[in-house]
From Swiss-Prot:
Homodimer. UreD, UreF and UreG form a complex that acts as a GTP-hydrolysis-dependent molecular chaperone, activating the urease apoprotein by helping to assemble the nickel containing metallocenter of UreC. The UreE protein probably delivers the nickel. One of its GO terms (cellular component) is cytoplasm. One of its GO terms (molecular function) is nickel cation binding. This is Urease accessory protein UreG. Keywords: Chaperone, Cytoplasm, GTP-binding, Nickel insertion, Nucleotide-binding. Gene3D superfamilies: P-loop containing nucleotide triphosphate hydrolases. GTP binds at G11, P12, V13, G14, S15, G16, K17, T18. It comes from the Bacteria. NCBIfam families: ureG. It is found in: Cytoplasm. GO terms for biological process: urea catabolic process. Transmembrane segments: none annotated. It comes from Edwardsiella ictaluri (strain 93-146). The gene is ureG.
Length: 209
């Protein structure tokens, strides 16, 4: 059976996780990648509805599923990811020719990581509006993620954040692990992020040719 790569996408509330999914999905599809999407909310499926609206006419809405976890975001993707695993397995069974399934966690703090039983890789999203010091906070989500996304770079002048300092601090705490700075409104850094996903997740670890 074909291996469908599972990619977790985590980060604090409002960092732009959903927006990242919305901008990378059509770009992945333009490169021949067939995606599936799962979103997590604690008491609603609002993110899934938002993604369906944004990607209407681009991705079949049956390939976008919302999971109402009823629990802390990290619990649903790490300590007890059973609800998400069930959703993943159901989507994979319905669409076995897919290449990647993106699993967006609910918004959480810098300690959020994904269980290896749920995700093969994960992307962690922070945003400039959280403050210049965020990379120095050194949380496991930020440090251990396979790719770190520093989103909303356009907000830097409004919150007094120096992007060069954020980038320098990121290199210190992450070493050689990849990161990218993005602006989903302008598309800045988005193609670079897609390049990373293709290179590090898909071409290297799947049957995509």
């Amino acid at each position: 059976m074909k291996k469908i790569i599972r990619v977790g996408i985590g980060g604090p509330v409002g960092s732009g996780k959903t927006a990242i999914i919305e901008v990378i999905t059509p770009r992945l599809m333009q490169r021949g990648i067939k995606p599936l999407i799962i979103t997590n909310d604690i008491v609603t499926t609002e993110d899934a509805k938002q993604v369906k609206r944004t990607l209407k006419g681009i991705l079949d809405e049956e390939k976008i599923v919302g999971v109402e976890t009823g629990a802390c975001p990290h619990t649903a993707v790490r300590e007890d990811p059973s609800m998400n695993i069930a959703a993943v397995e159901e989507l994979e069974a319905r669409f076995p020719d897919s290449d990647v399934i993106m699993i967006e966690s609910g918004g959480d703090n810098l300690t959020l990581t994904f269980s290896p039983a749920l995700a093969d890789f994960y992307i962690y999203v922070i945003d400039v509006a959280e403050g210049e010091k965020i990379p120095r906070k050194n949380g496991p989500g930020l440090v251990q993620a396979d790719i770190l996304v520093i989103n909303k770079t356009d907000l830097a002048p409004y919150v007094g954040a120096d992007l060069s300092v954020m980038e320098s601090d990121t290199k210190v705490v992450r070493g050689d692990r990849p990161y990218v700075m993005t602006n989903c409104k302008t598309g800045e850094g988005v193609e670079e992020l897609v390049d990373m996903i293709m290179r590090d997740f898909l071409f290297t670890h799947s049957e995509i040719k």
